[in-house]
A protein has these predicted regions:
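Long, structured protein-protein interaction/assembly regions in large complexes
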Residues: 1-215
Length: 215
């Protein structure tokens, strides 16, 4: 977790904020489009407030599956006089892989004023079997978002309610790492921790047990 100081009546109040570190950054994800995703050039990073999360257990090779949910986010985050509902315009799209076409489209939209800010993030991979999927499930329990996949839960079925908790405060995108700051649902986190303890107990190798313990 991270400790943040916020102004209070008497000096500062210290608040415990849960943090989720990710061993991936824009260097691993964005390729030649890195510069278009940077919004804090002084620190060479991207910071998005009140992020939402679209989590996909698969590769994104074209924009078509993304368009329905992107349109929903765009409409919901529009000014109230245009029918918006105050929804966040900041969306983190997490998947196994992004094609050049998808990266180019997201990058071009990111720099356009008045558009939603959707950025890609490749799921980290380790030597553990199905590590992409394990990470996505871990992440989903922290941010409160649904994991989509090509067969049982296609992206076209995504709704605003599938994009995570309102208590996620920020997403920091660095060169080789990322961090989510926010308050998860304690019951979701505890449920996932219990699952991981069970996985560790039946791990087929010492390495697998160690990697599960790390998570």
């Amino acid at each position: 977790f991270t400790i943040l100081e916020q102004p209070g009546v008497d000096g500062f109040e210290v608040e415990q904020i849960e943090g989720f570190p990710i061993a991936r950054g824009f260097e691993d994800t964005c390729g030649r489009f890195i510069e278009q995703f940077i919004n804090d050039r002084a620190n060479y990073r991207t910071v998005l407030e009140k992020p939402k999360f679209l989590i996909y257990n698969g590769k994104l090779n074209d924009m078509n599956p993304l368009m329905p949910i992107l349109e929903k986010v765009a409409n919901a985050s529009a000014p109230k006089e245009q029918g918006g509902i105050g929804f966040s315009e900041n969306l983190i799209i997490v998947a196994h892989h992004f094609s050049e076409n998808v990266l180019a489209t997201l990058a071009n939209n990111f720099v356009q004023p008045g558009t939603i800010k959707a950025i890609p993030l490749k799921a980290p991979i380790t030597s553990q079997a199905n590590s992409h999927y394990h990470f996505l499930v871990d992440l989903s329990h922290f941010v409160g978002a649904k994991v989509f996949d090509p067969l049982s839960a296609p992206l076209e079925s995504a709704t605003l309610g599938h994009l995570g908790l309102d208590s996620m405060q920020s997403f920091e995108y660095m060169r080789y790492r990322s961090t989510i700051i926010g308050k998860p649902d304690e019951m979701l986190v505890l449920a996932r921790a219990e699952e991981l303890y069970k996985q560790k107990a039946v791990a087929e190798s010492i390495l697998d047990a160690e990697l599960t313990a790390e998570r």
